[in-house]
């Protein structure tokens, strides 16, 4: 289950890069604005990581993971409502906040469930989900975006995340 959630964690964050040309055309975004969209998620994610770890130490890890999954998935879907740069920037930053709780909680769970003999293997397997999500997210967001519009990419990814969390 952690592996699949992590796939969506990375697919959702990667999706925007594959639809940059569509966003640029529809919203007349500048290269600087595209760069800011690309980094908004990372700034919030990076700045909130320590706080997220402290929160995860005080709540049930499963709650942090599933709560984060629902929050970031709903925000991902809401991204489709964007009509300008400010909306996109807000949703990207908010999604970064939602996703920041996943890794502290998942690494803690993996450490607890796997002893010295299997811990590295478990974390290595989990790490593969990062690349599957990044590659798959980029590919499918671009594919969906080209054929059905960029908004549907975010609706599909976010919707699948919500279903996964149920």
Model-predicted segments: where are they?
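Small-residue-rich segments within alpha-helical transmembrane domains of MFS-like 12-TM solute carriers
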Residues: 10, 14, 80, 96-104, ...
């Amino acid at each position: 289950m952690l592996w699949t959630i992590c796939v969506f964690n990375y697919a959702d964050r990667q999706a925007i890069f594959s639809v940059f040309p569509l966003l640029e055309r529809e919203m007349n975004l500048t290269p600087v604005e595209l760069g800011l969209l690309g980094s908004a998620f990372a700034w919030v994610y990076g700045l909130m990581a320590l706080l997220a770890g402290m929160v995860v130490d005080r709540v049930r890890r499963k709650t942090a993971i599933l709560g984060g999954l629902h929050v970031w998935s709903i925000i991902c879907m809401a991204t489709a409502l964007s009509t300008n740069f400010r909306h996109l920037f807000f949703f990207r930053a908010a999604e970064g906040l939602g996703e920041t709780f996943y890794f502290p909680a998942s690494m803690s769970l993996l450490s607890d469930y796997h002893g010295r003999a299997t811990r590295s293997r478990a974390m290595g397997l989990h790490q593969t989900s990062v690349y599957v999500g990044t590659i798959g997210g980029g590919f499918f967001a671009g594919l969906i975006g080209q054929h059905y519009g960029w908004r549907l990419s975010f609706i599909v990814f976010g919707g699948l995340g919500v279903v996964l969390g149920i």
